[in-house]
Amino acid sequence: MKNLISILTASVLLLCCTGNTIHFGSSDEIPANTVLLLELNKGVSQQQLSEACNFLKENFPALKIVKGGKVQLPSSCYNGKRYRADSILRYLDQIKPDSVSKVIGITSSDISSTRTLIRKGKKMTYPDYGILGLGRRPGTVCVVSNHRMGGNAATFSKTVLHEFMHTLGVRHCTHEKCIMQDGNGSGKNMRESTHVHKECLAIAMEGLD
């Protein structure tokens, strides 16, 4: 916890949000592998945010994690029922500072995407399926929502890691209990996951280089 506090409170980087642009308030050199955490709309509790940061650092000690301010998502991301995860990723792409390597958007708002799932042996396409998170693979942005997690902080932290690893090029994993398993439209696999398989971690480390 002490290391996390120093990461989040040290005045290495000061951020402010103006319109659709994030400005750095310091001219200091931005460290390599800097990840910017942005709270979208209401964000999440500070405890959940801290635990997610700790979990990222446990798995990727070289990461420099910087906590940004709160950002209100534009109405273009909202479909009247949920916020579209793909639209959020496009928005994060637009506001991402060039000086950071990744942006993780964190929200308590409900998010969705178009999903094709197997239901009773048949493929079913759902145009507005509620999800836990979405990340570009590979890419520089991802988003995670705790709306469907029932306050489960461990599931939230694991989902943040899961989507972040997608940005590093890691695909879904078939190994049992790996955090990178496909949720298949349910949060069960994420809740029951216990670790990152060594093959997934190796691919992720290559993505950090």
Task: Please state what every model-predicted region is.
Residues 2-10:
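Sec-dependent signal peptide recognition
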Residues 31-44:
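Fold-level signature of zinc-dependent metallopeptidase catalytic domains
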Residues 15-16:
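C-terminal motif of bacterial Sec signal peptides marking the signal peptidase cleavage site
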Residues 20-29:
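Sec-dependent signal peptide cleavage junction
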Residues 146-209:
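The catalytic-center signature of Zn2+-dependent metalloproteases
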